[in-house]
């Protein structure tokens, strides 16, 4: 299975819809496992504050914050594919979180890989913009 640019960009949106549902508490029981399934077992990220985070830590973050941001809205825009091979895509996008407490905007760069015939997120780097 070769990775397709449009599917990679759609994955950004699908994943962030699930994140918004989980954080807002407006999610179904299957949404958290579906969200975690987007990530490769070896996934790691560097969050916007500069901390290195493993898949287990990301999973814990989602589990522990279910319903704790009822007013969160996540908007994704400026998606660009930087590099594409048959089995990997590097892309960037801007992510805007709006809550009653304020707005956070970050620019992210992610690596998606084909693993066992599925598109999985392997790496993510976030940088605060505002």
Describe these PLM feature segments:
Residues 2-11, 17-29, 44-130:
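A beta-strand edge to alpha-helix "cap/lid" segment located at domain peripheries
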């Amino acid at each position: 299975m070769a990775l397709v640019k449009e599917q990679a960009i759609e994955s950004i949106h699908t994943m962030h819809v699930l994140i918004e549902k989980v954080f807002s508490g407006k999610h179904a029981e299957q949404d958290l496992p579906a969200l975690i399934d987007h990530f490769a077992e070896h996934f790691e990220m560097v969050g916007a504050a500069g901390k290195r985070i493993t898949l287990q830590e990301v999973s814990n973050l989602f589990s522990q914050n279910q319903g704790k941001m009822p007013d969160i809205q996540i908007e994704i825009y400026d998606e660009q594919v930087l590099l594409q091979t048959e089995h990997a895509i590097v892309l960037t996008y801007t992510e805007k979180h709006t809550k009653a407490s304020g707005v956070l905007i970050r620019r992210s760069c992610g690596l998606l890989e084909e693993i066992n015939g599925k598109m999985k997120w392997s790496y993510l780097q976030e940088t605060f913009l505002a």
